[in-house]
């Protein structure tokens, strides 16, 4: 049995993201005093009274708005309601009961899911009376809280976990492969993830930047279990004017940090940009597994040499990571979609690969025989022993006479030898050098 899912729903700006972040213990959703700022579902793991569960923060519901984004947010909330075991219906105790609350309540009653009515922004004891009018919603006794001050959260969670079945409380931590999809706005990240998930999971529209935060989705396939992280598209700084866009840039870097595999998506009709190089360069610098996907390949006029030519140009622009894997797809038509997670899994397998110490030392000894280390100053590097000390990425320690003797060109040679012999395609690897006195 998987972990129970708790969805936090309500009209815009009632404090859902603030509550979500308090419960998650970290800043996950973009929070700003602008209605509609949380535009997509965001997941986080939480625990209360030994019950582990997954929370979903939804975009605010505005049932009568015709705005394209708000209508899609409403659809997202409906999907969250369909998925949830328990729903926290958050309302604003300062503003009081609003017509939109009535309509949200109707949606929730139709869901026939357990609902905990929570009145937020009750910052003082005297404000408790503000909660009484919410009895009119017909959803039961309201719980009063102040999410910004973390007041009343324990009482609220007590009510939530009452609805969990006993056999749902022991969900185990997922051993999932985390994949971050990164790239410029409107390159097709959300469209690809939706294809992989088989549901309209993310806000997809022709408006650049419709994914403003980093969103997690889960999918199980024959190749493994994956967490798919869709990030806000990164723009040049001159174009990033809104405060909210700055948050999203930070979130993209944070998503790369927690990813196992980073997929850089490039628009085949536009090619690679400096911004693409910068963001994937960060993933390279911290030694992530990397897959470069060229999307919208269906829009390119081509012959039998077009793909090779395109790949060569990419490799020139991404020469700092010659190990990256490449895939040409069309998220719109489904071309080569089945290979996306398969190839990502191959990258992950190399990212977590271990090499036996004996075999490793045989390869390095052979490499030294083929190419002796250069003399640096008056010393020649001597390599006594090498061992792998970790994965994610594969990390190797070379015990040598003097780490100062390692020339960058010889270090690159050793890395290439490891790659050629053990197939680390698609992942960064780390080489460290430590001094050891000769016996």
UniProtKB/Swiss-Prot annotation:
Taxonomy of origin reads: Bacteria, Bacillati, Bacillota, Clostridia, Eubacteriales
Pinpoint the KH-like domain residues.
353-437
Which residue intervals define the domain EngA-type G in the entry? 4-168, 177-352
**Species in which this protein is naturally found:** Clostridium botulinum (strain Langeland / NCTC 10281 / Type F)
* Pfam families (alphabetical): KH_dom-like (PF14714), MMR_HSR1 (PF01926)
Oligomer and partners = Associates with the 50S ribosomal subunit.
Question: What protein name is recorded for this chain?
Answer: GTPase Der
**Does the record bear GTP-binding in its keywords?**
yes
Instruction: Please state the span of the N-terminal signal peptide per the UniProt entry.
Output: none
InterPro entries, alphabetized? AAA+_ATPase (IPR003593), G_ENGA (IPR031166), GTP-bd (IPR006073), GTPase_Der (IPR016484), KH_dom-like (IPR032859), KH_dom-like_a/b (IPR015946), P-loop_NTPase (IPR027417), Small_GTP-bd (IPR005225)
Task: Return the HAMAP family for the record.
Answer: GTPase_Der
What task does this protein carry out?
GTPase that plays an essential role in the late steps of ribosome biogenesis.
Where GTP 2 binds, per the record, is at 183-190, 230-234, 295-298
* Membrane-spanning parts: none
